[in-house]
Amino acid sequence: MKVVHTIQDLRDHLRGQNRIAFVPTMGNLHEGHLALMKLARQHGDPVVTSIFVNRLQFGPNEDFDRYPRTLQNDIEKMDRDRDVYMVFAPDEREMYPEPQNYRVLPPDDLGDVLEGEFRPGFFQGVCTVVLKLLSCVQPRVAVFGKKDYQQLMIVRAMCRQFQLPVEIIAHETVRASDGLALSSRNRYLSVEERAEAPRLYALLGELRQRVLDGERDVAALEAEAAARLAAHGWRVDYVSLRRQHDLKTPGAADFETRQPLVALAAATLGATRLIDNLEI
């Protein structure tokens, strides 16, 4: 497995390749990331992954400086699984050699709701770095996890609207045996918080079942789920039922025509903010 740190080296090694499968990450890899790489290998060759902690997507009170940098450990994990041909691990100067004044701004109705409401500028930072990485790597396919559902939808829409020659492939959320979605931030949970954390997924499962059983009062369903989380010590940002294809709130016609829906939630347990979702 090759490790490169500059865009020039990346392009030199990949010259002539037209079936590249790409998995962008911020490092601190876990089994969920490795599953994305395994799926990428089924859809292209060679598999390239990036490790870059992108400052643009962190807010002023978020954990950019605290975010774990574990490059050597990450390399060892990927080398063990042998799914990845090349790791692109640039530093900040390589990705942003000058102030990034040109940025990608998602539409308000997609980028300023849910995560975008509570993390202003987050998706602008995500889209900007993803566009830059796609320009550097030039993949045929790129794999993203459904755990970051809104991010997946926004990146997919960006690639479609810019007519980028890349297919965005989604991987199902990888979970621990008790249902907790794997996340680099899970390491911040205390023993007691880790025992409580699966409640988020369990509540989404109950919400899903109630919709399948015919309940249609979206606001009441959301409020009840949020209240139940709060009763167990969570600080809830949102529990929201949305249409899958555009993340808008479903109306009566959507239920009648059985439009695919998704339940999404974000809440903080102790000092750790967790997100999850479940398709319906």
From Swiss-Prot:
GO terms for molecular function: ATP binding; pantoate-beta-alanine ligase activity. HAMAP family: PanC. It comes from Bordetella avium (strain 197N). It is found in: Cytoplasm. Beta-alanine binds at Q57. (R)-pantoate binds at Q57, Q151. InterPro entries: Cyt_trans-like (IPR004821), Pantoate_ligase (IPR003721), Pantoate_ligase_C (IPR042176), Rossmann-like_a/b/a_fold (IPR014729). Signal peptide: none annotated. ATP binds at residues 26-33, 145-148, 174, 182-185. GO terms for biological process: pantothenate biosynthetic process. One of its GO terms (cellular component) is cytosol. Pfam families: Pantoate_ligase (PF02569). The reaction proceeds by a bi uni uni bi ping pong mechanism. It catalyses: (R)-pantoate + beta-alanine + ATP = (R)-pantothenate + AMP + diphosphate + H(+). Catalyzes the condensation of pantoate with beta-alanine in an ATP-dependent reaction via a pantoyl-adenylate intermediate. Keywords: ATP-binding, Cytoplasm, Ligase, Nucleotide-binding, Pantothenate biosynthesis. The active site is at H33. Pathway: Cofactor biosynthesis; (R)-pantothenate biosynthesis; (R)-pantothenate from (R)-pantoate and beta-alanine: step 1/1. Homodimer. Its EC number is 6.3.2.1. This is Pantothenate synthetase. Belongs to the pantothenate synthetase family. The gene is panC.
